[in-house]
């Protein structure tokens, strides 16, 4: 009797939680289908007018990416530069009056007689400026700065009196060196007792150069450019490896293997060349230059050969320095405004 009673109790509890069935609901689509369709605002657009734009947008072209856009910009506008734009180089100065270095009217050739003496025209001191003076008074600021700094360093090291003695000795050695060269290159004279002179190291330094020099035409001879109004005293005019050159002998304590190490010496050489070619005292024409840097310790000298093209370039620079000097002199002589 216990089992039926328990079962009845369970049924009564389940009846409490039973859910009543909802009445059936019918979904009707008739009203939706029969209702009036709303008009789309885009249908009012003139589609034919924009058909080309639609086709271009919906075309099957490659998708644009940041990389492709950058490449396109590079093609259209060039690559993006992260550096500053380079400043335009200053235009090279050109002389106002381009006087030629060579004399087209001169056809005379140098004499080849070994017994004839080289020209030795003395320098006449007058109001015409010398090549050395012109170059000194138009020295570029950078070159002048380094020269002054060298002087200050030497004075600190040697003192005022010591530096004066040093420069005096350098000048004396250079003078003796040129005197010895004049003796070597003159047919009538010979160098004697070279080893007892201070310049013996310099002479040893240029031995390999002397073997290639012949046909000496002038030694320690004055030149004057009648048209450009300047004078000078050249060291030598002779043939070097078969080319007639104005030769400038220089001494140095430091090696100068490059022509730019000689500073204004090339301008000095071409100034003498132009003067020789237009000086009535000389019948020949010089087309090349040679700078020989000799060393006191006897180490091989450095020869710097200047061909016709290089001489023409330095000649243009010399004309600029000459114009600068002339302009400075005009400014100095001009009367001050009242």
Swiss-Prot record:
Database matches in Pfam families: PDDEXK_1
Location(s) in or outside the cell: Mitochondrion
GO biological process, one term: mitochondrial genome maintenance
Coiled-coil region list: none
EC numbers, comma separated: 3.1.-.-
TM annotation in the entry: none
Domain of life, source organism: Eukaryota
Transit peptide start and end: 1-64
EC top class named in words: hydrolase
GO cellular component: mitochondrion
GO molecular function, one term: single-stranded DNA 5'-3' DNA exonuclease activity
Catalytic residues in the record: 235, 248, 250
Keywords: DNA damage, DNA repair, Exonuclease, Hydrolase, Mitochondrion, Nuclease, Transit peptide
Family: Belongs to the MGME1 family.
Role, per record: Metal-dependent single-stranded DNA (ssDNA) exonuclease involved in mitochondrial genome maintenance. Has preference for 5'-3' exonuclease activity but is also capable of endonuclease activity on linear substrates. Necessary for maintenance of proper 7S DNA levels. Probably involved in mitochondrial DNA (mtDNA) repair, possibly via the processing of displaced DNA containing Okazaki fragments during RNA-primed DNA synthesis on the lagging strand or via processing of DNA flaps during long-patch base excision repair. Specifically binds 5-hydroxymethylcytosine (5hmC)-containing DNA in stem cells.
Protein name: Mitochondrial genome maintenance exonuclease 1
Organism: Mus musculus (Mouse)
